[in-house]
Amino acid sequence: KPVFEGRFNLGVVSLHLPMILAKARRESKDFYEVLNYYLEMIRNLHKRTYEYIGELRASVNPIAFCEGGLLGGHLKPDDKIKSLLPPMTLSYGITALNELQRLYNGKSIREDGEFALEVMKYINNYTNKIKEEDHLLYAIYGTPAESLCGLQIKQFRKIYGIVENVSDREYVSNSFHCQVS
């Protein structure tokens, strides 16, 4: 019998990793303490989203939920859709991994990606742990977020100003990409 997992993303919330490192430094806190705060915040948002969506009736999207557009999507219009949600993901988005590494030690992830890799392993271990605890399919998502990447620069600059190779362009890099120049 085929197994279908991660065939539908219920939502992604993207971490602004350079902002988290800058905040930790400004507040003289451990980076992972601040990162945990945001990981838990996103976890709680995802759990609320899952519960909210699970209470929706199949009639909100009859092609997907009543006419078989999604695996198991043969519910009656008044049925709640919670039974269809288990194979769907709740994602932690990653942007600006290269800028995180640059802020950490001035090097790109091509020159020295150790800290960036350490952070990704940490987030992966965290999501694996909470998958078991919450029985939800959490995922890590390399955010392809062109408009978000521009917004994140504005947010960073507003608080921390222009930092060379971190916030001196009009956008941060998508997910784990490097700037080309």
Language-model features: locations:
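Conserved catalytic cores of very large enzyme subunits
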Residues: 1-86, 107-181
